């Protein structure tokens, strides 16, 4: 048979199958734009600003609608009420982790963030308990953050008031806090292993936010057959895992079953206790993936928020001045900030919350999935269907936060200048899959930002009106543009 005819017939069959699958899969799914065969709605979405596209679709189809990424339907939930209903009221039903092909290639479905079922429940329960035992959200970890803040100040002083890119410094500080919990040690800022880890983490976060990776997540075959930045991400992750394995082996050689030093020790002890269980979720591969999850989630997200926060404070000098005035009044210059100060610093607390709200770090959350057939409003969501929850639609809701595109700590202050909580504040998500490092991240952001502003004035190289705070990427995460600044000792 003519090869051209074979190709035409094959493509025709694929198109027919795609059309059949999309039409038969609609059932009682929410409405949405008509998908194209094979590629779905991908051409109707701005890959560089997915949140904007979702907002436009919600105006046409309402707060719950269906998009097709390739041939697979994905339900999108938009707006506070719908997001809360999906993630809290139906938290168990939507507690599955959605499809993320590049990450599945990295960790084989292991770890905490991208695992499912019993594996996820057991590892999350163990990790939460272990992290709490090592002080997450408590005074002991606060001491660790304060010590790291002092080290950060010393490193910033070494810039001698010269212009610098803060990315490296702001990556090291939160990463070292996590290292103390996971590896039982912090690194000097010039340690070669540490520098290599920081480089790999930063590169991978940038790659995950590239438009190319969003295309690969829609058409996973590209990951296997085409060149591209995804190969660099996979190589970087392999190097990170290799380093973790090296540290695991060091821990195994010095392990004291009765005196665990850190997260790795606790996991190794759990492995030993379950060594006779052939179905145990606690294996060496699982340990490496879990440590990678804890390390990546606990460092890159906080460092990016800090970097974005300083950029916003550079642009909004009046906010910086008010925060520094409050710092001088409540803390002074002779002691380190502590978490007890926060209740007496409503404006600073509001500023930290506003940074997180404005930055909107993970705009469309990490994808969820239905663990069973779910009746959601007037629709039936089949088991295994991916769910995108728009956190942008909550954090930038103009009814809760007037002028949401403007950076303004008053969004979290009442008429008397007291701190005002908001149910719409969910940068860590909500429900069963909410970020388990929330308490740690909140402490880090408050203590590190206040310590920096206690010790330094921030000076921009450009006029404040020329400072651009628009993210350079807004796909998986929001990444601030590169910038330099002066840290001027106060």
Curated annotation (Swiss-Prot):
<dbReference type="GO" id="GO:0005506">
    <property type="term" value="F:iron ion binding"/>
</dbReference>
<keyword id="KW-0597">Phosphoprotein</keyword>
<comment type="similarity">
    <text>Belongs to the cytochrome P450 family.</text>
</comment>
<keyword id="KW-0349">Heme</keyword>
<dbReference type="InterPro" id="IPR036396">
    <property type="entry name" value="Cyt_P450_sf"/>
</dbReference>
<keyword id="KW-0560">Oxidoreductase</keyword>
<protein>
    <recommendedName>
        <fullName>Cytochrome P450 2C28</fullName>
        <ecNumber>1.14.14.1</ecNumber>
    </recommendedName>
</protein>
<comment type="function">
    <text>Catalyzes the N-demethylation of aminopyrine and benzphetamine, but does not catalyze the hydroxylation of tolbutamide, testosterone, and progesterone.</text>
</comment>
<feature type="modified residue" description="N6-acetyllysine">
    <location>
        <position position="249"/>
    </location>
</feature>
<feature type="modified residue" description="Phosphoserine">
    <location>
        <position position="127"/>
    </location>
</feature>
<feature type="binding site" description="axial binding residue">
    <location>
        <position position="435"/>
    </location>
    <ligand>
        <name>heme</name>
    </ligand>
</feature>
<dbReference type="GO" id="GO:0071614">
    <property type="term" value="F:linoleic acid epoxygenase activity"/>
</dbReference>
<dbReference type="GO" id="GO:0016712">
    <property type="term" value="F:oxidoreductase activity, acting on paired donors, with incorporation or reduction of molecular oxygen, reduced flavin or flavoprotein as one donor, and incorporation of one atom of oxygen"/>
</dbReference>
<dbReference type="Pfam" id="PF00067">
    <property type="entry name" value="p450"/>
</dbReference>
<dbReference type="GO" id="GO:0019369">
    <property type="term" value="P:arachidonate metabolic process"/>
</dbReference>
<dbReference type="InterPro" id="IPR017972">
    <property type="entry name" value="Cyt_P450_CS"/>
</dbReference>
<dbReference type="GO" id="GO:0043651">
    <property type="term" value="P:linoleic acid metabolic process"/>
</dbReference>
<dbReference type="InterPro" id="IPR001128">
    <property type="entry name" value="Cyt_P450"/>
</dbReference>
<dbReference type="GO" id="GO:0006805">
    <property type="term" value="P:xenobiotic metabolic process"/>
</dbReference>
<keyword id="KW-0256">Endoplasmic reticulum</keyword>
<dbReference type="GO" id="GO:0020037">
    <property type="term" value="F:heme binding"/>
</dbReference>
<dbReference type="InterPro" id="IPR002401">
    <property type="entry name" value="Cyt_P450_E_grp-I"/>
</dbReference>
<keyword id="KW-0408">Iron</keyword>
<keyword id="KW-0479">Metal-binding</keyword>
<keyword id="KW-0492">Microsome</keyword>
<keyword id="KW-0503">Monooxygenase</keyword>
<keyword id="KW-0472">Membrane</keyword>
<keyword id="KW-0007">Acetylation</keyword>
<feature type="modified residue" description="N6-acetyllysine">
    <location>
        <position position="375"/>
    </location>
</feature>
<dbReference type="GO" id="GO:0005789">
    <property type="term" value="C:endoplasmic reticulum membrane"/>
</dbReference>
<dbReference type="GO" id="GO:0008392">
    <property type="term" value="F:arachidonate epoxygenase activity"/>
</dbReference>
<dbReference type="InterPro" id="IPR050182">
    <property type="entry name" value="Cytochrome_P450_fam2"/>
</dbReference>
